[in-house]
């Protein structure tokens, strides 16, 4: 029996260009913020309401390099990963926490800048084994193939 499930699936737009850095042993790390939006109609006023959530996403190794090369602010992506909370101390010695998503799979859902949509997976943070699956016509959504994805682009500010 499973001890628990820690899985996150998100579709959203990047809020900024990816920031790619390298660890001392040469592993790539990319950090992005991803906006996801929910819309609903207010029962009392009938007005359409929207709430945008911002998520911190971390990519590692080859997946981080792909993110740095192909994604830009506003890029629409699908990610799968797991939640992780980190703890550190600030300058005053106060404990601080942040929760982020460690991505192990990413699909580009648009082809801004002339690039191809693609599916990429990274199932290792330590660099021991990376998995990258090249896009195929049966796996890759096209720019006009958003029929299964709700259209949240209308009110996102980028």
UniProtKB/Swiss-Prot annotation:
GO-annotated cellular components: nucleoid
Biased composition (Polar residues): 129-142
Residue span(s) of domain SSB: 5-110
CDD domains tied to this protein: SSB_OBF
Keyword terms of this UniProt record: DNA damage, DNA recombination, DNA repair, DNA replication, DNA-binding
Top-level taxon of the source organism: Bacteria
Motif Important for interaction with partner proteins, residue range(s) on this chain: 153-158
Pfam family, one: SSB
Membrane-spanning residues: none
Keyword DNA repair in annotation: yes
Region ranges (Disordered): 109-158
Gene3D superfamilies on file: Nucleic acid-binding proteins (2.40.50.140)
InterPro entries with a match to the protein in the record: NA-bd_OB-fold, Primosome_PriB/ssb, ssDNA-bd
Keyword DNA-binding: yes
Function: Plays an important role in DNA replication, recombination and repair. Binds to ssDNA and to an array of partner proteins to recruit them to their sites of action during DNA metabolism.
Protein name per the record: Single-stranded DNA-binding protein
């Amino acid at each position: 029996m499973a001890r628990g499930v820690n899985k996150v699936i998100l579709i959203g737009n990047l809020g900024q260009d990816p920031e790619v850095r390298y660890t001392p042993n040469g592993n790539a790390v990319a950090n992005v913020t991803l906006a996801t939006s929910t819309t609903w109609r207010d029962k009392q006023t009938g007005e359409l309401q929207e709430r945008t959530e911002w998520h911190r996403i971390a990519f590692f190794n080859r997946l981080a390099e792909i993110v740095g090369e192909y994604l830009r602010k506003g890029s629409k992506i699908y990610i799968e990963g797991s939640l992780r909370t980190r703890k550190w101390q600030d300058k005053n010695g106060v404990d601080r926490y942040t929760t982020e998503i460690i991505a192990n799979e990413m699909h580009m859902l648009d082809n801004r800048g002339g690039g191809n949509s693609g599916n990429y997976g990274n199932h290792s943070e330590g660099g021991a084994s990376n998995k990258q699956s090249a896009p195929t016509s049966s796996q890759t959504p096209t720019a006009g193939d958003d029929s299964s994805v709700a259209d949240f682009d209308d009110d996102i500010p980028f």
